[in-house]
A protein has these predicted regions:
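Helix-turn-helix
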Residues: 6-9, 16-55
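Hydrophobic alpha-helical connector segments
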Residues: 55, 68-103, 155-159
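Short, basic, alpha-helical segments at the C-terminal edge of helix-turn-helix-like DNA-binding modules
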Residues: 58-65
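Long, intrinsically disordered low-complexity tandem-repeat segments
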Residues: 204-236
Length: 237
């Protein structure tokens, strides 16, 4: 086996081990046992385990991002419903229980990154990658008039934070069983945050009208009560 092939086999072994047991399982001995070589050989090809763990993490999560985002083409969003449909599919995909192996890798990377600067840097890079991709989708939606312009970054950040949080919760079974419904509610919150000002204004106007009607009703009731009061007193007298 050539040096390149040997290095590739070590990487593939580490990738498989991480998917099965998470990043915390990546030790020189565990990888060596997985590949069927000596620990010394693994250490020879990958002398820095911190950097190797970062490489394994980056490879797995970058592949997932490419797979998920490939479902979005460059065609314009004709309306908000079309944007909603596309994003709903994306969220449902990311919340799918079949992806819990990648979720565990993300969660462990956030924790291990506190002591592994190479991993921390790669985590930031991959999160920036997700933020950039999602911003691009929302920016296209804004250009097509589906959401308010200038809110793509906020919408992308909110979507990413909610998906990451809900996925982390699911690892300890602290999440609704109906993930599809969870996805719909999450998406509604994101799109409401990026709704055009006209729509927000309409909601405010409706709320204001309701308040005005309520106030008018109370005023009318008060006047009616006042007009009845003198009559009542006169009758009593």
């Amino acid at each position: 086996m050539s040096p390149q092939e040997r290095d590739h086999s070590i990487l593939e072994g580490a990738l498989g081990l991480a998917r099965e047991s998470g990043l915390e399982s990546l030790t020189v001995r565990a990888i060596a046992a997985r590949v069927g070589v000596t620990p010394a050989l693994v250490a020879h090809y990958r002398p820095g385990m911190d950097a190797f763990v970062a490489d394994v993490f980056g490879s797995i999560v970058a592949d997932e991002r490419e797979e998920v985002i490939s479902a979005f083409d460059d065609s314009p969003f004709r309306d908000t419903d079309e944007l909603r449909g596309g994003l709903l599919r994306l969220i449902e995909t990311l919340l799918d229980a079949d992806r819990d192996d990648v979720t565990l890798i993300w969660v462990q990377a956030w924790a291990l990154g506190a002591r592994n600067e190479a991993l921390a840097a790669r985590v930031r890079q991959e999160m920036d990658g997700w933020q950039s991709v999602l911003e691009g989708i929302f920016a296209r939606a804004a250009a097509d008039g589906a959401i308010e312009a200038g809110r793509a970054d906020t919408a992308a950040w909110l979507l990413l934070a909610m998906v990451d949080g809900m996925n982390a919760h699911s690892l300890v079974k602290w999440a609704p069983r109906d993930r599809a419904d969870l996805a719909r509610r999450a998406l509604s919150a994101v799109l409401d945050s990026a709704a055009p000002d006209a729509l927000v204004g309409a909601r405010s106007s409706d709320a204001g009208s309701a308040d005005t009607r309520s106030t008018d009703t109370r005023s009318t009731d008060a006047r009616s009560t006042d007009s009845r009061s003198p009559d009542s007193r006169s009758t009593d007298t």
